[in-house]
């Protein structure tokens, strides 16, 4: 990838030669010679890149060229940095250190020119041809919605595997394991995803777990990952034995479905250890695994491996067409003919067809397609398939501005879930992004990322809270890794990762160290990226200020750091400073505003009393996650006025703002690139200026996420309407007890999530307009602690809340649940019996979690009669509940039933239990007065799991073999009984 970085250095040289710095210190001729030398060498680089694959001397030549290029980049970078510093000093160009500086630069220039002359002379023996390289991808408009392409030709395979799962689940008496076997790029993972998401599998198995293995078959890591997947949250570090016990408790008696994707482990002992833990599941529990290795299939499989065949020529062609032409109606017949010849070379491998289709998507000249068809790369030695030549071709047909950005992704381990925004910051730090017109570098990086996605280099796109995450196929990752080999020189280490969580790997110019010491910084003066996150640091040494090339510094998660050295502010090239979750950090250096190149300052999770003074001087700043308003000049909202901020920002200590004119100084309405805004006051709610201040903080209409905390005004601002919040998808309002009414949320066309916490006693309806809005996009509604809330709408209609799926109501004693046809999940703390009766209005409900706060002794008989779709029911903290309604029997679809802390509950209804024919899990805990279990349990043939804890009377009656209730539960495979 030398050709890509040479272009970066050439662009820097060209830009530099046009500026005044080169004239002031007298190196114009030297830099001009460097530029000419690189231009001469660059002309033959495309040919060299293609030929190096089977020519070791040529590969070595490229490595030497790459090392020299990085050396030139260091010289240029240091020259610009120090020259700028001299000019900004009081002495200007007459600074006393200018002469030794010129001598040092001149000596280094002579040395690197000698190296480049030797490299240029050596190239002649390779007889390389000059070729024109495409510099940048074609300009086109792209949208923000990212979707995976249609899957072709695997429906038959999906149905066959689903049938195996279902049939085995019905017959098996032990854990079943089915390996899907096939070479890389055939679509084993895609097929497994289709099976995993099939409705038939979802209905028959619970829980469903997906784990990617790759090269690391570590039992502790895998068990931890499985537990985290089931519980949906991160797990603190634990020893293996308690991890094994926890997983067995979670899987005990469950007919689970586990996918182990991309397995390479050939050690039978490792698999045997994991299998022993997994065998606690119910009859029919199933493990589906994907692998390229027959030995892995024979070790793991209890069933005959499913060997995945190549795609048919027709399906391969459809996949290629979808990528190459999109939805274009008219297709050049000559391109179709050439395309079919290219597809033949793909050998029925989907990844090859998809990737080659991606690189040709915006090429419409026949010669461009012929160049791919006739490339000599097809004739190179192949290992397991035709996939690697196809992937190499995809790289060689990338424009220059994409190549190095793609190859850099090799520093992440396989199957890493990468954040697009972070990756773009890394690209910027290494100088891979070229300026383009008036676009910000972040926008250029976004274009590059979209180009690589459209060419199928990235996959598995997810968007969470406004951030985009993605992965790379393991073969695409292998390609990036192989191309990184030219950067293995130890003389140009530019990135160090010293964290403990395996987030990045050591490759090329990136080095991972197991621990950090201050002396480490003195060894690597060319560093662009220094990652010390979660390194348990107490302090950062002042020598950090000597890393003049440093662009990216990550100190996040170092909760012991209380302050940062003043010399940090000497890092004139620093672009990203990541300090999030440095819990003890209370202040930043006063001279932080001198970090003139800073673009990303991440401060969420710190304990700052105020943001550093005069932060508005950081005119390059694009991401400022947190702004803490101070009391003194230079710490106030006006510092945000001229900053073109991107992403999200949380503004706190708004109670310190006394005038709406001060709030207007923030100029939020002009910040079109902010997608998330959080505004917070101290929670005492006694701020007389809050209403005027919030009105003055009107955001831009591009905003998507809005949160307001501790607002003390009596009404929310007029700008909370359709015109300003037309793109908002999520609103959260907490601690606004003085607001007597709510804005017209129902008119917001894109609002998907609405959370209201602790509201005024004057609020009776979420929307009390005579003509209320429809809430056309709302899917999630959470309301806490509204003492007089009676309903959602004062005037209900037929078309309101058409897609609402999830509702949560806590501490709303007057609330009556309306009739809503789409709601599937309800969580409610019952504060009035009326709420219990109104639950029956939600006929589509599949999950119900109710807790009591009214001392109810019984539940309404009609409560369950209309809930025919209910699958999960949890009843907790009904301290005085003595009996359950017989209408429980109408819940024919119920799979899971749980009772917790129902102290007075004496029995479960005999007739009610008999009707629960689909029940697979019953859990009763802390029901101290429960006297016995119903006889009807014997007839629940689907019941596989029974858990009884802290129920002393029943516990004794369930003693194995001799207890009075033992015969009622003896047929249940998995029992958990604790006194």
From Swiss-Prot:
Q: What is the effect of changing residue 88 to L?
A: In susceptible haplotype
The source's superkingdom equals Eukaryota
**Placement of LRR repeats on the sequence:** 524-547, 549-570, 571-594, 595-619, 637-661, 748-773, 823-841, 842-866, 868-890, 891-915, 917-939, 940-965
**Outcome of swapping residue 715 to L:** In susceptible haplotype
Q: Where is the NB-ARC domain?
A: 143-437
Q: Name one GO molecular function term.
A: ADP binding
Q: Which Pfam families match?
A: LRR_14, LRR_R13L1-DRL21, NB-ARC, Rx_N, WH_DRP
Q: What else is known?
A: Belongs to a four-gene family located at the same locus. Although the four genes are expressed in the resistant haplotype, only RGA2 confers the resistance to P.infestans. In the susceptible haplotype, RGA1 and RGA3 are likely to be pseudogenes created by deletions and mutations, while RGA2 also contains several modifications.
Please give the family membership noted in the entry: Belongs to the disease resistance NB-LRR family.
What does the protein in this record do? Disease resistance protein. Resistance proteins guard the plant against pathogens that contain an appropriate avirulence protein via a direct or indirect interaction with this avirulence protein. That triggers a defense system which restricts the pathogen growth.
Q: Any idea what this protein is called?
A: Putative disease resistance protein RGA1
**Organism of derivation:** Solanum bulbocastanum (Wild potato)
Q: Gene of origin?
A: RGA1
């Amino acid at each position: 990838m030398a050709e890509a970085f040479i272009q970066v250095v050439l662009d820097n040289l060209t830009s530099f030669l046009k500026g005044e710095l080169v004239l002031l210190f007298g190196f114009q001729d030297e830099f001009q010679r460097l530029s000419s030398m690189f231009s001469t060498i660059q002309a033959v680089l495309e040919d060299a890149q293609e030929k190096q694959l089977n020519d070791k001397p040529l590969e070595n030549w490229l490595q030497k060229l790459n090392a020299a290029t990085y050396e030139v980049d260091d010289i240029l970078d240091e020259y610009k940095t120090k020259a700028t510093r001299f000019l900004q000093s009081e002495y200007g160009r007459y600074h006393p250190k200018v002469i030794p500086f010129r001598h040092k630069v001149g000596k280094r220039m002579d040395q690197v020119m000698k190296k480049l002359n030797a490299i240029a002379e050596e190239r002649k023996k390779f007889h390389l041809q000059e070729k024109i390289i495409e510099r940048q991808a074609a300009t086109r408009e792209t949208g923000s919605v990212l979707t995976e392409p249609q899957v072709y030709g695997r429906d038959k395979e999906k149905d066959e595997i689903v049938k195996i799962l279902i049939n085995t689940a019905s017959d098996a008496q032990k854990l079943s394991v089915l390996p899907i076997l096939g070479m890389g790029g055939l679509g084993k993972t895609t097929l497994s995803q289709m099976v995993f998401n099939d409705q038939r599998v979802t209905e028959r198995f619970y829980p469903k777990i997906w784990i990617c293995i790759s090269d690391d078959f570590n039992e502790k890591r895998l068990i931890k990952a499985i537990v985290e997947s089931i519980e949906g949250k991160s797990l603190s570090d634990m020893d293996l034995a308690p991890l094994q016990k926890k997983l067995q408790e979670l899987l005990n008696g469950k007919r689970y479905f586990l996918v182990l994707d991309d397995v390479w482990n050939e050690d039978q002992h490792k698999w045997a250890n994991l299998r022993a833990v997994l065998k606690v599941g119910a009859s029919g529990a199933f493990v589906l695994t994907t692998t390229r290795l027959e030995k892995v299939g024979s070790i793991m499989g209890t069933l005959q491996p499913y060997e995945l065949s190549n795609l048919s020529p027709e399906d391969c062609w459809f996949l290629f067409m979808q990528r190459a032409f999109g939805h274009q109606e008219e297709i050049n017949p000559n391109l179709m003919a050439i395309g079919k010849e290219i597809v033949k070379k793909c050998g029925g491998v989907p990844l090859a067809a998809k990737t080659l289709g991606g690189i040709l998507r915006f090429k419409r000249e026949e010669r461009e397609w012929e160049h791919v068809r006739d490339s000599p790369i097809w004739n190179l030695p192949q290992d397991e398939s035709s996939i690697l030549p196809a992937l190499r071709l995809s790289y060689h047909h990338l424009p220059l501005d994409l190549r190095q950005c793609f190859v850099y992704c090799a520093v992440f381990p396989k199957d890493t879930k990468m954040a697009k925004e972070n990756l773009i910051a890394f690209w910027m730090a290494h100088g891979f992004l070229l300026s383009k017109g008036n676009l910000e570098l972040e926008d250029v990086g976004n274009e590059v990322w979209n180009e690589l996605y459209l060419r199928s280099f990235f996959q598995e796109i997810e968007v969470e809270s406004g951030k985009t995450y993605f992965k790379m196929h393991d073969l695409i990752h292998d390609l990036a890794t192989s191309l990184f080999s030219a950067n293995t020189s130890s003389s140009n280490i530019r990135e160090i990762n010293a964290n403990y969580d395996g987030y990045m790997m050591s490759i090329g110019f990136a080095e991972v160290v197991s621990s950090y010491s201050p002396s480490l910084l003195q060894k690597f003066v060319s560093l662009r990226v220094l990652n010390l996150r979660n390194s348990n640091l107490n302090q950062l040494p002042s020598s950090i200020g000597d890393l003049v090339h440093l662009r990216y510094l990550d100190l996040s998660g170092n909760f012991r750091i209380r302050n940062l050295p003043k010399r940090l502010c000497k890092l004139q090239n620093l672009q990203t400073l990541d300090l999030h979750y440095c819990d003890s950090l209370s202040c930043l250096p006063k001279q932080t505003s001198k970090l003139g190149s800073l673009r990303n300052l991440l401060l969420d999770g710190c304990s700052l009393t105020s943001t550093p003074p005069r932060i508005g001087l950081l005119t390059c700043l694009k991401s400022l996650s947190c702004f803490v308003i101070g009391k003194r000049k230079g710490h106030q909202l006006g510092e945000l006025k001229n900053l073109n901020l991107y992403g999200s920002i949380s503004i706190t200590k708004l109670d310190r703002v006394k005038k709406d004119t001060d709030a207007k100084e923030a100029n939020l309405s002009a910040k079109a690139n902010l997608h998330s805004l959080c505004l917070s006051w101290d929670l005492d709610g006694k701020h007389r200026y809050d209403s005027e201040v919030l009105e003055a903080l009107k955001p831009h209409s591009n905003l998507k996420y809005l949160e307001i905390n501790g607002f003390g005004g009596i009404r929310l601002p007029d700008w909370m309407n359709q015109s300003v919040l037309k793109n908002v998808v999520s609103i959260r309002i907490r601690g606004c007890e003085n607001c007597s009414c709510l804005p017209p949320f129902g008119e917001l066309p894109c609002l998907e999530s609405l959370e209201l916490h602790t509201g005024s006693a004057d609020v009776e309806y979420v929307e009390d307009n005579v003509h209320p809005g429809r809430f056309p996009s709302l899917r999630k509604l959470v309301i806490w602690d509204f003492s007089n809330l009676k309903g959602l709408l004062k005037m209900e209609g037929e078309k309101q809340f058409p897609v609402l799926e999830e509702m949560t109501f806590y501490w709303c004693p007057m609330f009556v649940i309306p009739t809503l046809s789409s709601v599937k999940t309800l969580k409610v703390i019952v504060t009035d019996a009326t709420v219990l009766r109104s639950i029956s209005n939600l006929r589509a409900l599949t999950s119900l979690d109710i807790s009591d706060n009214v001392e109810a002794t019984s539940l309404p008989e009609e409560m369950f009669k209309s809930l025919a779709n209910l699958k999960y029911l949890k009843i907790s903290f009904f301290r005085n509940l003595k009996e359950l309604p017989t209408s429980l029997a109408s819940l024919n679809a119920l799979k899971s039933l749980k009772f917790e802390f129902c102290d007075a509950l004496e029995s479960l209804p005999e007739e009610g239990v008999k009707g629960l024919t689909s029940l697979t899990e019953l859990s009763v805990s802390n029901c101290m007065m429960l006297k016995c279990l119903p006889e009807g349990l014997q007839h629940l043939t689907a019941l596989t799991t029974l858990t009884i804890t802290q129920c002393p009377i029943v516990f004794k009656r369930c003693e194995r073999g001799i207890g009075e209730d033992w015969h009622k539960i003896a047929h249940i495979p998995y029992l958990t009984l604790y006194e």
